[in-house]
Amino acid sequence: MKIQTNAVNVLERTSAYLRTGVIKETPAWYNVVASIPPVTKFTREPHKINPSTDKKVSELKDPDLESVNRNGLYKTRFNALERKVANKQIYKPPKLVYLEDKIRTLFYKQHPWELARPKIVSENEINTNPDWKNMLQLGQPLDGENVVQRTLYLLKTKEQSNITDAYDQARLEFYRLRMQQELEEQVAAEEAEMFGSVFGPSTIEHGVTKEQQVIEKWKRDAELQSELLSAKKENASKAAGDASAVSSEKQVEDDVVNFDESTDADQEVLHF
């Protein structure tokens, strides 16, 4: 089948039509196609460079002429598997990687208990244009997201040239604010108790109470099951003892009957 080249020559034909007056107005796509002309080479070649990463997909290594296989022969050529170019994923889009995700993952890996704090999804939507000159933001609680955004701000404003130093500075500010927050909460609780406030059990105490109730129920069920098993064993042993006693009595009766029969037979023989 002949290769169709009409679409490739559209720029030349349109230029000729414009010069001869066949087309009066320049098409909207003319300048774009003129700046980026279509490819005129139709020879298909294997893609050995990934256009997304500009890295080689595969590269044949020179055979090791000094190594000998198990048959005592030298390898001088590539096999079919080595010549195969694995370019199935060459046009697969690369994964999107953001610096925020790396910082966020590192922070919550180092501080896993920060994930246990209650959080509302709409908290970040309150202030859509925050200024991260300060760690604390109006309407947004202190959490790991403050550390992430503060680190990016330090890098963007060139206050810290290294991401490690920026992350350490953001963590230090976070620790100071967290300690201040916990101290304020503790002082407020002590003042409230001084004025007569009574606080109920905390979440941890409530969980421990519920767990203890389950353990007590399990203990009662285990004791009941143990009593049932011991009763079954006693009944089984008692039934086995009764059966052995009945069989022994029956054996005695049979022995007595056999003895009487043998005695009568001996007396008849003597009388005769």
Curated annotation (Swiss-Prot):
Belongs to the mitochondrion-specific ribosomal protein mS23 family. The keyword Ribosomal protein applies. Residues 233-272 are annotated as: Disordered. GO terms for molecular function: structural constituent of ribosome. Keywords: Mitochondrion, Ribonucleoprotein, Ribosomal protein. PANTHER family: 37S RIBOSOMAL PROTEIN S25, MITOCHONDRIAL, SMALL RIBOSOMAL SUBUNIT PROTEIN MS23. Residues 252-272 have a biased composition (Acidic residues). InterPro entries: Ribosomal_mS23_fun. It is found in: Mitochondrion. Pfam families: MRP-S25. GO terms for cellular component: mitochondrial small ribosomal subunit. Component of the mitochondrial small ribosomal subunit. This is Small ribosomal subunit protein mS23.
